Curated annotation (Swiss-Prot):
<comment type="subunit">
    <text>Component of the WASH complex.</text>
</comment>
<dbReference type="InterPro" id="IPR021854">
    <property type="entry name" value="WASH1_WAHD"/>
</dbReference>
<dbReference type="GO" id="GO:0055037">
    <property type="term" value="C:recycling endosome"/>
</dbReference>
<feature type="region of interest" description="Required for WASH complex assembly">
    <location>
        <begin position="1"/>
        <end position="51"/>
    </location>
</feature>
<dbReference type="GO" id="GO:0016197">
    <property type="term" value="P:endosomal transport"/>
</dbReference>
<dbReference type="GO" id="GO:0055038">
    <property type="term" value="C:recycling endosome membrane"/>
</dbReference>
<keyword id="KW-0813">Transport</keyword>
<dbReference type="GO" id="GO:0005769">
    <property type="term" value="C:early endosome"/>
</dbReference>
<dbReference type="Pfam" id="PF11945">
    <property type="entry name" value="WASH_WAHD"/>
</dbReference>
<dbReference type="GO" id="GO:0043014">
    <property type="term" value="F:alpha-tubulin binding"/>
</dbReference>
<dbReference type="GO" id="GO:0034314">
    <property type="term" value="P:Arp2/3 complex-mediated actin nucleation"/>
</dbReference>
<keyword id="KW-0009">Actin-binding</keyword>
<dbReference type="GO" id="GO:0043015">
    <property type="term" value="F:gamma-tubulin binding"/>
</dbReference>
<feature type="region of interest" description="Disordered">
    <location>
        <begin position="294"/>
        <end position="411"/>
    </location>
</feature>
<dbReference type="GO" id="GO:0031901">
    <property type="term" value="C:early endosome membrane"/>
</dbReference>
<dbReference type="GO" id="GO:0015031">
    <property type="term" value="P:protein transport"/>
</dbReference>
<dbReference type="GO" id="GO:0005829">
    <property type="term" value="C:cytosol"/>
</dbReference>
Length: 472
């Protein structure tokens, strides 16, 4: 008995009963085929029932979850209290989904294993050629009368084989040519040479397509603007709703619904309204009370950082006849607290010779004004008045004028001396001791400078004395 081929995608196979068999042989083949058909059908229906039961169990689980959620919703419908619902950001599903599997996965064909051998005792009938010819009249015989197979064989390798598992096995290596449809001789250097039917070689080659309208009519295509697909948050126009603060006895609305600031940051572009924390108030009552009690007890607490010593008072200026300095008052003696265990004579000597800041350290809050007051104020600073300084300058100028006019008493000499002094004052030069008794500037440059008229003098207090000299 010849072996029957089965399609590779099928899980089961059934043998066919061959014609022209002996009676006993035909009965055995029919019996074996029907038994195998019964086994295959039972296996198929059992797999279908198993898949139906699996889907039914899954549907029951989904219905159970649905009924539970529906019961929770029904319980929350009559409640008038605010309820927080936390939604998971991740979909409630397993990390790896279960792949679909066919119901015939793992099915095995047991026909080859269950094939039995039977011993036939009857003999074959002699061959009758006339009977064979008569059977050809009644049984259809497929005869290919067209020559399409020959033409297709010339174009390609023929029909596709059954053992092709991938596209790479179908196409030529590193190309897109299907050799079963069109045979191609590939040369990497010379290009692709195609072997075709000799009858088709006389046909005209395909013409190129017409050029587009943008080239033939010289039209320019409009450049399309690129669309922006980025997410741009926008609140838009928020409607203003005027409703009362509380709406009691409404169906499906909670009565104790309150909004607080701990809902988290808002979404863009709204600005996060974070309240500024209030700083604690600072009071100095406790500090002042503690400092007063410490002073009453005679104890001074040292400051945390050592304060820098105040600057020493400026040295007194030289005494003048106009403002004699007043004697400084004696420093106030502060009695030091007596120690319980006695004091060392070496320590007393060091304390007596040390400055006041070292003996009694300050609390680090001494200011410049306090140091000025301790120095004696205006009375001990030996300060001079501005008016007294002006009077002294005026007297010095008068003495210089008297010394300059001592050489001659005529009008021309006085005028010459005045002009020389005025030019020196404008130029900023101070006359030396020997120049005060001289006759005046000499030389060509000095004579030229004498011809230049002097600048008008500024309005000063000494101008009245000059006018008096002119009038005299």
């Amino acid at each position: 008995m010849p072996q029957n081929r089965s399609v590779e995608s099928q899980a089961y196979s059934l043998p066919l009963i061959l014609p022209d068999l002996r009676r006993e042989e035909a009965i055995h083949q029919i019996t074996d085929t029907l038994q195998h058909l019964q086994t295959v059908s039972n296996d198929i229906f059992s797999r279908i029932l198993q898949r139906v039961e699996t889907n039914r169990d899954q549907l029951q689980r989904i219905n159970g979850r649905l009924s539970l959620a529906q019961a929770k919703i029904e319980r929350l419908k009559g409640s008038k209290k605010a309820i927080k619902v936390f939604s998971s950001a991740k979909y409630p599903a397993p990390d790896r989904l279960q792949e679909y599997s066919s119901i015939f996965a793992g099915a095995k064909d047991g026909w080859s294993a269950k094939k039995q051998r039977h011993k036939i005792q009857s003999k074959h009938r002699p061959l009758d050629e006339q009977a064979v010819q008569e059977k050809l009249k009644y049984f259809p015989v497929c005869v290919n009368t067209r020559g399409q197979d020959e033409e297709s064989a010339e174009e390609g390798l023929g029909s596709l084989p059954r053992n092709i598992n991938s596209v790479s096995s179908l196409l030529l290596f590193n190309t897109t040519e299907n050799l079963y449809k069109k045979y191609v001789l590939l040369d990497p250097l010379a290009g692709v040479v195609t072997r075709t039917n000799p009858a088709l070689e006389g046909e005209d080659e395909e013409k190129l397509f017409d050029a587009p309208l943008s080239i033939t009519k010289r039209e320019q295509l409009e450049r399309q603007t690129a669309e922006n697909y980025f997410y741009v948050p926008d609140l838009g126009q928020v409607p203003e709703i005027d409703v009362p603060y509380s709406l009691p006895d409404l169906l499906g609305v909670a009565d104790d619904l309150m909004y607080s600031a701990d809902l988290g940051p808002g979404i863009a572009p709204s600005a996060p309204g974070v309240p500024i924390p209030e700083l604690p108030t600072f009071t100095t009552e406790d500090i002042t009370e503690n400092s007063i009690t410490d002073r009453q007890d005679g104890r001074l607490l040292p400051p945390p950082p050592p304060p820098p010593p105040p600057p020493p008072p400026p040295p007194p200026p030289e005494p003048s006849a106009l403002s004699p300095p007043a004697p400084p008052p004696p420093p106030l003696s502060i009695p030091a607290p007596a120690k319980k265990g006695g004091s060392d004579p070496g320590d007393q000597g060091a304390v007596q010779g040390a400055p006041k800041e070292v003996v009694n350290p300050s609390n680090g809050r001494a200011s410049l004004l306090e140091s000025i007051r301790q120095a004696g104020g205006i009375g001990k600073a030996n300060l001079r008045n501005v008016k007294e300084k002006k009077l002294e300058k005026k007297k010095m100028k008068e003495q210089e004028q008297v010394g300059a006019t001592g050489g001659g008493g005529d009008l021309m000499s006085d005028l010459f001396n005045k002009l020389a002094m005025r030019r020196k004052g404008i130029s900023g030069k101070v006359p030396a001791a020997g120049e005060a008794s001289g006759d005046g500037p000499t030389g060509a440059f000095a004579r030229i400078s004498d011809t230049i008229p002097p600048l008008p003098p500024p309005h000063q207090a000494s101008g009245d004395g000059d006018e008096d000299d002119w009038e005299s």
